[in-house]
Structures are given as C-alpha cells and as structure tokens.
Curated annotation (Swiss-Prot):
Its cofactor is Mg(2+); thiamine diphosphate. Belongs to the transketolase family. DXPS subfamily. GO terms for molecular function: 1-deoxy-D-xylulose-5-phosphate synthase activity; magnesium ion binding; thiamine pyrophosphate binding. Pathway: Metabolic intermediate biosynthesis; 1-deoxy-D-xylulose 5-phosphate biosynthesis; 1-deoxy-D-xylulose 5-phosphate from D-glyceraldehyde 3-phosphate and pyruvate: step 1/1. This is 1-deoxy-D-xylulose-5-phosphate synthase. Gene3D superfamilies: 3.40.50.920, 3.40.50.970. It comes from the Bacteria. InterPro entries: Dxylulose-5-P_synthase, THDP-binding, Transketo_C/PFOR_II, Transketolase-like_Pyr-bd, Transketolase_BS, Transketolase_C, Transketolase_CS. Keywords: Isoprene biosynthesis, Magnesium, Metal-binding, Thiamine biosynthesis, Thiamine pyrophosphate, Transferase. Binds 1 Mg(2+) ion per subunit. Binds 1 thiamine pyrophosphate per subunit. Homodimer. The lineage of its organism: Bacteria, Pseudomonadati, Pseudomonadota, Gammaproteobacteria, Enterobacterales. The gene is dxs. It holds the Pfam family Transketolase_C. It catalyses: D-glyceraldehyde 3-phosphate + pyruvate + H(+) = 1-deoxy-D-xylulose 5-phosphate + CO2.
Length: 620
C-alpha cells in the first residue's frame, strides 16, 4: 500500500531516527498515535505479528529519540515487538511486505538494516549479545551505548539469567529494558513509580549513591547499614530485588505508554555506569481493543478487517497436524493416567489447548525453557511416567545436549512430538525446521519416524508412546493434513517401510509428508514408490532390495540433505558395497528465506514439477 501523508502527517516527517530527533518533544504523543494507527492499517492488510508491536510504540519512539541510533546499539529480543522500530528506521513504506517473499524480514535482521544490530527470531539472546557488544564498545572507546529490550516471557529463559549473572560480574555499561506486558498498571502505583524512577535514575541520587559507597566503603558496619537502608527504601515500592542481587541497578516499574516519562527516565539512565535495568509496564495490543482483550489470538494475524475487530475464521477444511497431535494426546490421556505432556510456552501452536483444559494436572508449560523441558521429561520417565514433549523442530535445537545426555544415554522412554518440521514459511531462516533429522539421526538408540499423512502420524505417535527401550521422535509439518481416513490405532513394526507403488528402473524412497508429490512423480515416471516411515532404524533390507531391483534410487525428504535421511540410505548402500546411483533430494545447504510454504517448495524444486525435473536432469 502507498503511504498516506494526509492520514499520518507527523509520521510522514520521520523516515529515519535523525528526522525523529528533530521533532519537538511535544509532538511525540501525536507521533505515537499515528504510528500505532499505521501499524494497525499495515498489518491488517498484509498479516504479521501484531499485538506485541502495538505495546511497544512509546518505548520505540523514546529509545530512538534519546539514543543516537544506529551509532548507539539497540537490540531487540525475539523481534515480534520490533515492527514500530522498522517503521521508524527507513522501512516505513515497505512494512506492508513484511513476512512475504522478497519483503521485509519478520524479525530484526542484520542484512536488512544497520539499525538491526542482532538478527533474532528465537528468544532470550539479547542480553548475552548485548554484553559482548557493550564490551566491544568499551574497548572501542567511542562512547557508544548498548540497550537490550527483552519481554517478560523471554526473560524467563535460563540463557537470559546466565547473561545477567555474567553482566553483574564484569559490569559492562549497558541498559536492559524489561518490557512487562503481563501486569496492569493501576494509576496510583504507576504514578508513584514513574516519579520514583525519575528520582532514582537522576544524577543527584546516582552521585549520592556512588559517593556514599566510596566514602564509607572502608567502614563495614556503615556500608552494610547504607545497603540495607537503600534496599529498604527501594524495596517498599520496587520489585527489583532479584535484578539488584544479579548486580544491576534496578529502576521501575514505570508506565511504558508514557512517552514523555520514558524519555525523561532514559535520558537520566543514559550516562549511568555499569549494568542498568529498567522495568516498564505495557499492555499488549495497546490502542486496539480487540487485541487488548485477546492478545494471544492477536499475537500474529492474517489479513483482517480492523473495523470488525474479528479475525477471519478458518474455512473449516482439513485439520492441521497440530490438531491431529492434540486429538491423539487427549485420546491417549483418557486411557492412560501415566501420560504427561510438556511444552516450552507453545500451548496454542502445538495443539495442546484442549489437553491443558481436560488434564490440567498432567499438563506442564515450562515457559521458554527448552533445556529444562527435556530434562524435566527425563525425570518424569525415571519416575515411571510417560512424558510427551511437544516442541517445534527449530526450538528442539536449543536442547540438543539434554536429548543426548539426559534422555538417550539413559535410554529413557521420552517421546518428542516435533511440530513445524521442514519448511515453515513466513517466519524465515530462524524458524525453518530443516535440521532435526540430521541432528537426531546420529544419536544412538533413537527411533525417528516420518509420517506421510495424518493417519500414519497418529499410528506413529501411538507406536512411539508405547516404545519403552529409549527415546522416540515423530516429526510432522506445519499446515493442514491430507484428508485420509483415520484407522484404529495400532503399533507399527519398528524400522519397517512400505512399498506403495511398483514401477520399473527407478525407485523413490520417500520420508515424510512430501508423499503426495512423490506419488505424482512416481506415476509420471513409472517409478516404484516407497514410504520409508522410519529414518532410524532404517529398513536396510528394503533399501537393499530396492537397490537390487532398480537401476537408480531417489531419496526425498523435507530436511537438510546433509546428514539427513538420504545420507542414511547412502551409508547403508556403501556399507553393503552396493554402488547403485542415488539422487538425494531435500533442503539445500543454505538458510531458507521467508515466503509461503508453497513458494519455498516451488523455488527449491520440492513440488511435483520440481522433483520430476530434478530426476530427469539427473538421469539425462
């Protein structure tokens, strides 16, 4: 869409932070209002992350107004809340392309703008990177400031606390801003803390605080009295004891929607030495009532009519694989009281809402703590329960050591339900599920299953759940299932594939939900088609049989070619000295950018036409 200058006259004056800092301070509330309306107008037309950005409008304006960005370095954690940042940093007229093929990246991205200091997408990385950036800035000696913005969800992760603990030790000059949108600000508490924040961040308090410490540092009783007095004064109104104990100077909480107050506080804090912590209170979805009332639903939105306040309902078509998993989970839990389900803060995305309501005592949302989720599951298994860890492929990467050390080595019966495997789409490089087969396949005693449709997915979940000799994994994609009939649950024979079509000369060994495309290609080329089902253990007998009966083999998977299922087939053939030609088709050796799943598959040659073309070119 084209930018409407008449509709946004103040925002029209700002196409860079340099222009923002030229605006008179009294015009900033109007700028915030226009920025919020423009965000609503843009995202409702294009889709994207929504509620988080509405909540950070005033903070974004204040940060870029006070700090000399991009010289001063501003780091956003995760990046869901960074749409206003993109709008104010030269990307205003392109915001309608966000998350689209060739458009703006959904998260801060170093290759897109000098204002995007750190490429993000996964949570809780900002403080660690910020410490490194602050240390580098100190060695550079150019008086460059470092600011990290992290949400109340992301700060619960262990990595954030590891970073804060380190910052308290080496004491770099940096500011961490906690964007807390879980609590409401009552007028009296908000006003009191806004005033307190400006006092506590001011030069008078800072100089008295530091000066007093220096003067009385040699007198232990007085030093301790000063410390206790300061803690008592701040502790009466400030919930910052934890952050103070980690070595930060805590300020807040303050109203994150008072742009003038934020500017005053940030100006006071800008020159403070050592690690600083500013706690701001915001409302997710601020300024758009439907999003304020239901920020989870409005976290990420499709195109919608903002005047209606409603998101378009699904067409009522085929269920998604997440729902297939959620239905299986509820069905199994109703029959087996030993089932325990775990998610690292992905209840809605993983299809676990119904389970959490029906079985609240067996549902564990461990927050953004993937490492803990896996080892917690290990403990449940040791205790005689049957844990199911529902996790996105891209987030399981964060718990790799726990999968090996705490689960696999001990042969514990933990089942991993790996959602969003393969190409995910609009969230781009940071969220593609490209690597799980590669990084799990090398783990001893791991059973890995790749269903070709929703019925097989259910059977594999059932099989994995009842496997007691070690960990299992079932990986399935984002998106709708295929509409096949669901049959009664039964255990599949471990490590056995299934021939779906008999052909001549060429055999296609398919792993996973590219099966419909593989079937079209097999029909066109009169090839044999095999549903391999298991990546580990592989069906060696079937692979060798296909090699003996055909001139060439093709492996097909929606995972990185390097180290994936196709690599396993190659290893089997080499181990048995069978020099049959093999073409491995899968995800190439680069990070796959954003776009729809269909666009990505077409570009990568993973639709039926692309697969057929690859095979014909290879055979020519």
């Amino acid at each position: 869409m084209s930018f409407d200058i008449a509709k946004y006259p103040t925002l029209a004056l700002v196409d860079s932070t340099q222009e923002l800092r030229l605006l008179p301070k009294e015009s900033l509330p109007k700028l915030c209002d226009e920025l919020r309306r423009y965000l609503l107008d843009s995202v409702s037309r294009s889709s994207g992350h929504f509620a988080s950005g509405l909540g950070t409008v005033e903070l974004t304006v204040a940060l870029h107004y006070v700090y000399n960005t991009p010289f001063d370095q501003l780091i956003w954690d995760v990046g869901h809340q960074a749409y206003p940042h993109k709008i104010l940093t030269g990307r205003r007229d392109k915001i309608g392309t966000i998350r689209q093929k060739g458009g703006l990246h959904p998260f801060p991205w170093r290759g897109e703008s000098e204002y995007d200091v750190l490429s993000v997408g996964h949570s809780s990385t900002s403080i660690s990177a910020g410490i490194g950036i602050a240390v580098a800035a100190e060695k550079e000696g150019k008086d460059r400031r470092t600011v990290c913005v992290i949400g109340d969800g992301a700060i619960t992760a262990g990595m954030a606390f590891e970073a804060m603990n380190h910052a308290g030790d080496i004491r770099p000059d940096m500011l961490v801003i906690l964007n807390d949108n879980e609590m409401s600000i009552s007028e009296n508490v908000g006003a009191l803390n806004n005033h307190l924040a400006q006092l506590l961040s001011g030069k008078l308090y800072s100089s008295l605080r530091e000066g007093g410490k220096k003067v009385f540092s040699g007198v232990p009783p007085i030093k301790e009295l000063l410390k206790r007095t300061e803690e008592h004064i701040k502790g009466m109104v400030v919930p910052g004891t934890l952050f103070e104990e980690l070595g930060f100077n805590y300020i807040g909480p303050v109203d994150g929607h008072d742009v003038m107050g934020l500017i005053s506080t940030l100006k006071n804090m800008r020159d403070l030495k050592g690690p600083q912590f500013l706690h701001i209170m915001t409302k997710k979805g601020r300024g758009y009532e439907p999003a304020e009332k239901d920020p989870i639903t409005f976290h990420a939105v499709p195109k919608f009519d903002p005047s209606s306040g409603c998101l378009p309902k699904s067409s009522g078509g085929l269920p998604g694989y997440s729902k297939i998993f959620g239905d299986w989970l509820c069905e199994t839990a109703a029959k087996d009281s030993k089932l325990m389900a775990i998610t690292p803060a992905m209840r809605e995305g993983s299809g676990m809402v119904e389970f959490s309501r029906k079985f609240p005592d067996r549902y564990f949302d461990v927050a953004i703590a993937e490492q803990h989720a896996v080892t917690f599951a290990a403990g449940l298994a040791i205790g005689g329960y049957k844990p199911v860890v529902a996790i996105y492929s891209t987030f399981l990467q964060r718990a790799y050591d726990q999968v090996i050390h705490d689960v696999a080595i001990q042969k514990l019966p933990v089942m991993f339900a790996i959602d969003r495997a393969g190409i995910v789409g609009a969230d781009g490089q940071t969220h593609q599920g490209a690597f799980d087969l590669s990084y799990l396949r090398c783990i001893p005693d791991m059973v890995i299953m790749t269903p070709s449709d929703e019925n097989e997915c259910r059977q594999m979940l059932f099989t994995g759940y009842h496997y007691n000799d070690g960990p299992t994994a079932v990986r399935y994609p984002r998106g709708n299932a295929q509409g096949v009939a669901l049959t009664p649950l039964e255990k599949l024979p471990i490590g056995k594939g299934l021939v779906k079509r008999h052909g001549e000369k060429l055999a296609i060994l398919n792993f996973g939900t590219l099966m419909p495309e593989a079937a079209k290609v097999a029909e066109a080329l009169n090839a044999t088609l095999v549903d391999m089902r298991f990546v580990k253990p592989l069906d060696d007998t079937l692979i060798l049989e296909m090699a003996a009966q055909h001139d060439a083999l093709v492996t097909l998977e929606e995972n990185a070619i390097m180290g994936g299922a196709g690599s396993g087939v190659n290893e089997v053939l080499m181990a048995h000295r069978k020099p049959v030609p093999v073409l491995n088709i899968g995800l190439p050796d680069f990070f796959i950018p954003q776009g729809t799943q269909e666009e990505a598959r077409a570009e990568l040659g993973l639709d039926a036409a692309g697969i057929e073309a690859k095979i014909k070119a290879w055979l020519a």
